[in-house]
Amino acid sequence: MDFRPDQVVARIRGAVEGALTAQSVLGIGGALVLILVVIALLPDRFTRGEGKTATAVSSGAAQALPAALPGLSPFTPAKPLQFSGRVTQVASIGNDVGWGQVHVWIDNGTGALQEISVAPQSYLNQIGCPSFDGARISGIGFLFDAGRPNAELYAKSVLVGGRTCKLRDDEGLALWMTVQ
Protein backbone atom coordinates (compact mmCIF):
# COMPACT_ATOMS: atom_id res chain seq x y z
CA MET A 1 0.00 0.00 0.00
CA ASP A 2 1.31 3.37 -0.99
CA PHE A 3 1.14 5.91 1.87
CA ARG A 4 1.36 9.51 0.74
CA PRO A 5 0.26 12.42 2.95
CA ASP A 6 -1.48 14.32 0.16
CA GLN A 7 -3.67 11.30 -0.60
CA VAL A 8 -4.57 10.87 3.10
CA VAL A 9 -5.57 14.55 3.36
CA ALA A 10 -7.62 14.24 0.18
CA ARG A 11 -9.50 11.20 1.57
CA ILE A 12 -10.25 13.02 4.84
CA ARG A 13 -11.51 16.07 2.93
CA GLY A 14 -13.72 13.87 0.81
CA ALA A 15 -15.19 12.17 3.88
CA VAL A 16 -16.07 15.36 5.75
CA GLU A 17 -16.85 17.59 2.79
CA GLY A 18 -20.44 18.62 2.95
CA ALA A 19 -20.86 17.27 6.48
CA LEU A 20 -19.09 20.20 8.20
CA THR A 21 -19.09 23.80 7.07
CA ALA A 22 -16.49 26.39 8.03
CA GLN A 23 -19.00 28.08 10.34
CA SER A 24 -19.71 24.84 12.21
CA VAL A 25 -15.98 24.17 12.69
CA LEU A 26 -15.55 27.70 14.11
CA GLY A 27 -18.60 27.23 16.33
CA ILE A 28 -17.33 23.93 17.73
CA GLY A 29 -13.87 25.42 18.31
CA GLY A 30 -15.36 28.46 20.09
CA ALA A 31 -17.51 26.23 22.30
CA LEU A 32 -14.47 24.14 23.27
CA VAL A 33 -12.47 27.27 24.16
CA LEU A 34 -15.40 28.57 26.25
CA ILE A 35 -15.64 25.25 28.12
CA LEU A 36 -11.89 25.32 28.85
CA VAL A 37 -12.13 28.90 30.18
CA VAL A 38 -15.03 27.99 32.49
CA ILE A 39 -13.16 24.93 33.82
CA ALA A 40 -10.03 27.04 34.43
CA LEU A 41 -12.04 29.58 36.45
CA LEU A 42 -13.68 27.01 38.73
CA PRO A 43 -12.22 26.80 42.24
CA ASP A 44 -9.99 23.80 42.90
CA ARG A 45 -12.31 22.51 45.59
CA PHE A 46 -14.99 21.82 42.94
CA THR A 47 -12.72 20.29 40.34
CA ARG A 48 -10.70 18.15 42.77
CA GLY A 49 -13.49 17.20 45.15
CA GLU A 50 -11.81 18.89 48.12
CA GLY A 51 -14.74 21.05 49.19
CA LYS A 52 -15.43 19.10 52.36
CA THR A 53 -14.76 20.87 55.65
CA ALA A 54 -12.79 18.93 58.25
CA THR A 55 -14.26 18.71 61.72
CA ALA A 56 -13.10 17.24 64.99
CA VAL A 57 -15.45 15.54 67.43
CA SER A 58 -14.69 15.53 71.13
CA SER A 59 -14.96 12.17 72.89
CA GLY A 60 -17.34 13.46 75.57
CA ALA A 61 -19.92 15.02 73.27
CA ALA A 62 -21.26 14.68 69.78
CA GLN A 63 -20.64 18.31 68.91
CA ALA A 64 -18.56 19.02 65.80
CA LEU A 65 -15.74 21.52 66.21
CA PRO A 66 -14.08 23.39 63.33
CA ALA A 67 -10.58 22.21 62.48
CA ALA A 68 -7.70 24.61 63.18
CA LEU A 69 -6.62 26.74 60.26
CA PRO A 70 -3.43 25.51 58.63
CA GLY A 71 -0.32 27.52 59.48
CA LEU A 72 -1.60 28.92 62.77
CA SER A 73 -0.11 27.86 66.08
CA PRO A 74 -1.67 28.39 69.45
CA PHE A 75 0.28 30.71 71.72
CA THR A 76 0.01 32.34 75.09
CA PRO A 77 -0.01 36.14 74.84
CA ALA A 78 2.82 37.92 76.65
CA LYS A 79 1.72 39.78 79.76
CA PRO A 80 2.56 43.48 79.91
CA LEU A 81 5.34 44.24 82.42
CA GLN A 82 6.20 47.57 84.03
CA PHE A 83 9.73 48.91 84.00
CA SER A 84 11.46 52.01 85.34
CA GLY A 85 14.99 53.23 85.89
CA ARG A 86 17.74 55.56 84.75
CA VAL A 87 19.11 55.11 81.23
CA THR A 88 22.79 54.18 81.36
CA GLN A 89 23.36 53.38 77.68
CA VAL A 90 21.62 54.06 74.35
CA ALA A 91 22.48 52.14 71.16
CA SER A 92 21.01 51.85 67.69
CA ILE A 93 21.15 48.19 66.69
CA GLY A 94 20.67 46.92 63.14
CA ASN A 95 21.46 50.12 61.21
CA ASP A 96 23.90 48.19 59.04
CA VAL A 97 21.16 45.80 57.84
CA GLY A 98 18.40 48.37 57.28
CA TRP A 99 16.15 48.03 60.32
CA GLY A 100 17.85 50.24 62.89
CA GLN A 101 16.29 49.92 66.33
CA VAL A 102 17.07 52.02 69.41
CA HIS A 103 17.84 49.94 72.50
CA VAL A 104 18.35 51.39 75.97
CA TRP A 105 19.81 49.82 79.09
CA ILE A 106 18.37 51.00 82.38
CA ASP A 107 19.55 50.68 85.96
CA ASN A 108 16.38 49.68 87.77
CA GLY A 109 18.00 49.34 91.19
CA THR A 110 18.34 45.55 91.13
CA GLY A 111 22.06 45.60 90.38
CA ALA A 112 21.61 44.28 86.83
CA LEU A 113 21.01 46.40 83.74
CA GLN A 114 17.77 45.76 81.86
CA GLU A 115 17.77 46.00 78.05
CA ILE A 116 14.72 47.57 76.43
CA SER A 117 14.03 47.53 72.70
CA VAL A 118 12.38 50.86 71.90
CA ALA A 119 11.80 51.77 68.21
CA PRO A 120 13.61 53.09 65.13
CA GLN A 121 15.12 56.55 65.66
CA SER A 122 13.13 57.89 62.69
CA TYR A 123 9.85 56.91 64.40
CA LEU A 124 10.95 58.41 67.73
CA ASN A 125 11.73 61.68 65.91
CA GLN A 126 8.40 61.56 64.07
CA ILE A 127 6.33 61.24 67.26
CA GLY A 128 8.45 63.81 69.13
CA CYS A 129 9.87 61.44 71.72
CA PRO A 130 12.58 63.16 73.84
CA SER A 131 16.16 61.91 74.07
CA PHE A 132 16.85 58.92 76.31
CA ASP A 133 20.46 59.84 77.19
CA GLY A 134 20.73 59.75 81.01
CA ALA A 135 16.95 60.19 81.42
CA ARG A 136 14.80 58.55 84.04
CA ILE A 137 12.18 56.49 82.17
CA SER A 138 9.25 54.26 83.00
CA GLY A 139 6.80 52.32 80.92
CA ILE A 140 5.13 49.09 79.96
CA GLY A 141 6.61 46.38 77.76
CA PHE A 142 6.46 42.76 76.70
CA LEU A 143 8.94 39.98 77.39
CA PHE A 144 8.52 37.64 74.41
CA ASP A 145 11.41 35.29 75.20
CA ALA A 146 11.06 34.77 78.94
CA GLY A 147 13.13 31.56 78.86
CA ARG A 148 16.27 33.34 77.68
CA PRO A 149 18.44 34.93 80.38
CA ASN A 150 18.76 38.72 80.01
CA ALA A 151 16.12 38.79 77.25
CA GLU A 152 15.22 42.32 76.17
CA LEU A 153 11.89 43.87 77.00
CA TYR A 154 9.96 45.29 74.02
CA ALA A 155 8.52 48.65 75.07
CA LYS A 156 4.82 49.23 74.43
CA SER A 157 5.01 52.78 75.80
CA VAL A 158 7.72 54.83 77.48
CA LEU A 159 7.41 57.91 79.68
CA VAL A 160 10.52 60.05 79.15
CA GLY A 161 10.91 63.75 79.95
CA GLY A 162 7.23 64.04 80.90
CA ARG A 163 6.09 62.71 77.52
CA THR A 164 4.52 59.30 76.84
CA CYS A 165 5.78 57.72 73.62
CA LYS A 166 3.43 55.01 72.28
CA LEU A 167 5.46 52.37 70.45
CA ARG A 168 3.49 49.11 70.16
CA ASP A 169 -0.13 47.99 70.32
CA ASP A 170 -1.65 45.60 72.88
CA GLU A 171 -0.34 42.59 70.94
CA GLY A 172 3.19 43.95 70.72
CA LEU A 173 2.99 44.92 67.04
CA ALA A 174 5.05 47.96 66.06
CA LEU A 175 3.06 51.18 65.57
CA TRP A 176 5.73 52.59 63.23
CA MET A 177 4.77 49.98 60.65
CA THR A 178 1.39 51.73 60.17
CA VAL A 179 2.56 55.37 60.21
CA GLN A 180 2.52 57.07 56.81
Swiss-Prot record:
Main location class: membrane
Phenotype upon gene inactivation: Normal magnetic response, smaller, widely spaced magnetosomes. Near wild-type localization of MamC. Deletion of approximately 80 kb of DNA, including this operon, leads to cells that are non-magnetic, lack internal membrane systems, grow poorly, have reduced mobility and take-up and accumulate iron poorly.
Cytoplasmic topological segments: 1-21
Cellular compartments per GO CC: magnetosome membrane
Transmembrane segment boundaries: 22-42
NCBIfam families, per the entry: MamS
Family: Belongs to the magnetosome MamS family.
Organism of derivation: Magnetospirillum gryphiswaldense (strain DSM 6361 / JCM 21280 / NBRC 15271 / MSR-1)
Keyword tags: Biomineralization, Magnetosome, Membrane, Transmembrane, Transmembrane helix
Function: May play a role in magnetite crystal growth and size.
Protein name as it appears in the record: Magnetosome protein MamS
Cellular location(s): Magnetosome membrane
Protein induction: Part of the probable 17 gene mamAB operon.
Lumenal side: 43-180
Topology in membrane: Single-pass membrane protein
Miscellaneous information on this protein: This bacteria makes up to 60 cubo-octahedral magnetosomes of about 45 nm in diameter which contain membrane-bound crystals of magnetite (Fe(3)O(4)).
